[in-house]
C-alpha cells in the first residue's frame, strides 16, 4: 500500500485495487471495466463519512484484491453499503477463481462439445420456448458487472432490497427458486418481458429486439450501449465494428450480437473476449463457449459458429 498512487476521490486501498486489477495479464479477468471505475469514483464522492468508513472496513477485511474489486463492482452497480456488506459476507470464503466463475456464469472458457455448466446444470436458454436467447445473453452480460445478480443466480442468495427493474416480473416463488437453472430460466423470461414490453414495443414471441437489448444492457450496467446494423458486404464497416467489439469485450463489456439469414435476425450470442485473432463466443442454445476465428466474424469464413445461421445482422456495442 505504501507504493500505491494517490488518486483524487480514492483512498490508498482503492488505488491499490485499481493497480492490481490493471496488472492482470488477461484483461478479460479484470473485475471492473473503465465505465465501472468512473462510476465508482462518482459514488465514492457522494458517500457520507460514516458510509465511507463502513466501505473501507469491508475492503480492508476482504481476503484478496479480487474480493475487494468485487465489492467495488457491487458499489458501481448501485448497491447500498448494506448490500455491499451482504455480498462481502457471501463471497468471503470464495477463491478468486470461484469469483471469476460466478460472475461469468462459467461461460468464459471454451467448453468443447459439452457446453458450459454451473453446479451441474447447463447454462442455456429456456429449451421449451426458443425465444430467450437474447435475454440469456443479456443476463450473461449483466452478471459480469452486477455481482448481486451473479450471486443470486448462482446461489439463490438475494441482497436485502435488491430488486432490479429487469427482474420486476418475477414472482415470489421464482425469486425463491431452489436451483441455478430454475432461477436462470425465470430471469430470462423477466428480462424478455422487460425488453419487449417495458423498454420497447415488440412481439415477445420472436424474442428480444436489438434496440431493446441495448436499452436493457445500458439499464443493467455502467455502460451505455447502442444497436448497430452489421453489413458483412461492407469490409471496412465490418472490420471497424468487430474491432470495437473486441476492444469492448477485452475491457470487460461483453457484446451481444444477432445472427440470422439474409433478411431477419434469428438468434443472439455473446462475445466475451478476444485474443490472437479469435473471439470467445457464448452460444445460449447449447451453452457452448467457442473460439471463433476473426475471418468468420468478418463474414469471410465458414459461418459454422453461429448456431446454424449464416450472417451477423446486428451488434449491441458500447457507445464510443
Question: In which residue ranges do the predicted regions lie?
Answer:
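Generic N-terminal leader/targeting and pre-domain segments
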Residues: 1-68, 77
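Active-site nucleophile-adjacent alpha helix/oxyanion-hole segment immediately C-terminal to the catalytic cysteine
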Residues: 35, 86-196, 256
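Short amphipathic alpha-helical segments that mediate assembly, nucleic-acid/protein binding
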Residues: 12-15, 36-40, 51-55, 67-68, ...
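Active-site nucleophilic cysteine motif
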Residues: 126-143, 203-216, 267
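Low-complexity, serine/threonine/proline-enriched polar segments
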Residues: 185-215
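Long, positively charged binding patches that form subdomain-scale interaction surfaces
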Residues: 205, 211-264
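Noncatalytic regulatory segments and standalone regulatory/sensor domains
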Residues: 32, 40, 47, 55-63, ...
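Active-site signature of cysteine proteases
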Residues: 3-16, 28-31, 239-243, 247-251, ...
Amino acid at each position: 500500500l505504501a507504493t500505491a498512487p494517490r488518486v483524487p476521490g480514492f483512498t490508498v486501498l482503492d488505488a491499490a485495487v485499481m493497480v492490481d486489477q490493471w496488472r492482470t495479464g488477461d484483461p478479460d479477468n479484470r473485475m471492473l471495466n473503465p465505465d465501472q471505475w468512473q462510476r465508482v469514483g462518482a459514488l465514492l464522492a457522494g458517500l457520507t463519512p460514516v458510509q465511507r468508513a463502513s466501505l473501507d472496513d469491508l475492503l480492508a477485511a476482504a481476503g484478496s484484491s479480487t474480493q475487494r474489486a468485487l465489492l467495488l463492482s457491487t458499489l458501481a452497480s448501485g448497491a447500498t453499503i448494506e448490500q455491499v456488506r451482504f455480498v462481502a459476507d457471501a463471497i468471503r470464503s470464495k477463491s478468486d477463481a470461484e469469483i471469476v466463475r460466478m460472475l461469468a456464469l462459467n461461460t468464459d472458457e471454451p467448453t468443447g462439445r459439452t457446453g458450459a455448466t454451473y453446479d451441474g446444470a447447463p447454462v442455456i436458454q429456456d429449451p421449451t420456448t426458443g425465444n430467450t436467447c437474447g435475454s440469456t445473453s443479456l443476463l450473461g452480460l449483466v452478471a459480469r458487472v452486477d455481482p448481486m445478480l451473479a450471486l443470486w443466480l448462482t446461489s439463490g442468495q438475494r441482497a436485502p432490497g435488491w430488486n432490479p427493474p429487469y427482474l420486476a416480473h418475477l414472482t415470489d416463488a421464482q425469486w425463491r427458486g431452489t436451483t441455478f437453472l430454475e432461477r436462470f430460466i425465470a430471469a430470462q423470461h423477466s428480462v424478455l418481458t422487460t425488453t419487449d414490453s417495458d423498454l420497447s414495443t415488440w412481439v415477445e414471441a420472436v424474442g428480444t429486439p436489438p434496440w431493446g437489448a441495448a436499452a436493457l444492457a445500458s439499464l443493467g450496467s455502467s455502460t451505455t450501449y447502442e444497436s448497430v446494423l452489421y453489413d458483412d458486404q461492407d469490409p471496412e464497416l465490418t472490420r471497424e465494428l468487430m474491432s470495437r467489439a473486441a476492444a469492448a469485450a477485452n475491457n470487460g463489456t461483453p457484446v451481444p450480437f444477432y445472427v440470422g439469414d439474409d433478411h431477419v435476425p434469428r438468434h443472439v450470442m455473446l462475445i466475451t473476449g478476444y485474443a490472437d485473432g479469435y473471439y470467445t463466443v457464448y452460444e445460449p442454445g447449447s451453452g457452448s463457449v467457442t473460439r471463433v476465428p476473426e475471418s468468420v466474424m468478418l463474414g469471410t469464413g465458414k459461418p459454422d459458429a453461429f448456431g446454424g445461421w449464416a450472417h451477423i445482422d446486428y451488434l449491441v456495442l458500447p457507445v464510443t
